[in-house]
Amino acid sequence: MRFEGLIGARILKRINRFAVQIDVEGRTELAHLHDPGRLLEIVYPGNEVLVRRTDGPKLKWRIEFGKINGRYVLIDSGLHSDIARRFLPEGAVPEVRVGRKRIDFRYGDDYIEVKGCTLMANGIAMFPDAPTKRGLEHLKTLETLASSGYRSHVMMIITRDDVRCFYPNFETDPKFAEAFLRLVPAYVKAHFLTFGFDGLYLRYAGSIGLCADVGHGTNGRL
């Protein structure tokens, strides 16, 4: 995926979940952050981000990448489905209703839910970085589909290439993490795709697996 017209900026403060005050081109502006996660390791005062202009009525900028450990990581979750689509067969149908819920894609008897991951510790990619009731509901929907004879998938878009394996984040959301490990791979097939940014292109860096050498104690810490 190619990115053009990106401009360097610096975070001043996060106003709310979706608005961030930035210093860009010598001016203080408000930028849209399309990611509901906490992003504490990326979105903090003084950190560098890459932004692009938008035609929004109030927010004239959109944050695309944030810097961490000397590299830029995609933090625009609005692009996750576009990225995932490149790994799905032609004809995959987006935003499919299943009862009162929606799953990101369907292709024949396969249902695919897409999640984005930016959090890493000790080489381990982790999701979520904030409690996600919606994510848990998606897992339950995938379980129901699998029990009905369909094939259920979670595609994790990990927008960094410095990770060796994935593990659900027990410390942040033990309910989601427990459900994830119960369902994967018994009911749900998980795909962990990693990506790196070279300044112009977000490139696929390969797939990783579920960590086999990670445990969690009663306090849920990795």
Curated annotation (Swiss-Prot):
GO molecular function annotation: DNA binding
Concerning InterPro entries, the annotation shows:
SfsA, SfsA_C, SfsA_N
Q: From what superkingdom does this record's organism come?
A: Archaea
Coiled-coil annotation reads none
Q: Which NCBIfam families does this one have?
A: sfsA (TIGR00230)
Q: Which family does it belong to?
A: Belongs to the SfsA family.
Q: Which PANTHER family match?
A: SUGAR FERMENTATION STIMULATION PROTEIN A
Q: What is this protein called?
A: Sugar fermentation stimulation protein homolog
Task: Specify the species.
Answer: Thermoplasma acidophilum (strain ATCC 25905 / DSM 1728 / JCM 9062 / NBRC 15155 / AMRC-C165)
Q: Which gene encodes it?
A: sfsA
